[in-house]
Amino acid sequence: GSEMCIRDRFAAQKACFASGITRPVPHRLDQLCRLRRAILAHEQDIEAALQSDLGKCRTEAYMCEIGMVLSELGYLLRRTRRYCRDTHVLTPLAQFPARSFIRHDPMGVVLIMSPWNYPFLLTIEPLLGALAGGNCCILKPSKDAPATSAIIRQICAECFPLEEVAVVEG
C-alpha cells in the first residue's frame, strides 16, 4: 500500500544520496535552475491552485508565496557556492600547527511536511534549502490544499527524478 510506497521511495533516496550524485555544487545549482524555470512556466497554474484551495487572488498568490519563493531561489543561486565552502576556524593551541575548519556536508534524505495556509511557500522554500544543501527530499504537502499539492507534484515530476525529490500526497 501507501506505506510501502513511502518506504520504497525513502530507500531509493537513501541509495541516491549514498551514490554522491547530489553532492557536487554544480548539480545543486542545476536543480535550483530547473525548479526556477518550472515555477515560472507554471506561475498561472500555481495562482489558480492557490485560488482554488484558499481563495487567494493573483496578487496575494504572487506576493505571499510565488514571489517569495523566486526571491529565495535567486538568493540561493547567488550564494550556494559560498555556503558550501569550508569555514576556517581558530585551532586550539594544543593542536598547533594543525588547521581547523568546519565542513558543510549534506545529511541525506529530508522530509518536508507543510501546512495548508501557505501551501506553496512552506513546501517549496524548505525544499530550496535542502537541495542547495545537497540532500534528497520527500515532500508531504497538506491534504487540505489539494490543488496546490497537485501542481507541486507536477512541477517536481518535471524537474527531478523520484530518487532526488518525491511528493507524497494525501
Predicted feature residues:
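Rossmann-like NAD(P) dinucleotide-binding subdomain of oxidoreductase/dehydrogenase enzymes
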Residues: 93-170
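N-terminal Rossmann-like NAD(P)+-binding subdomain of aldehyde/semialdehyde dehydrogenases
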Residues: 2, 6-101
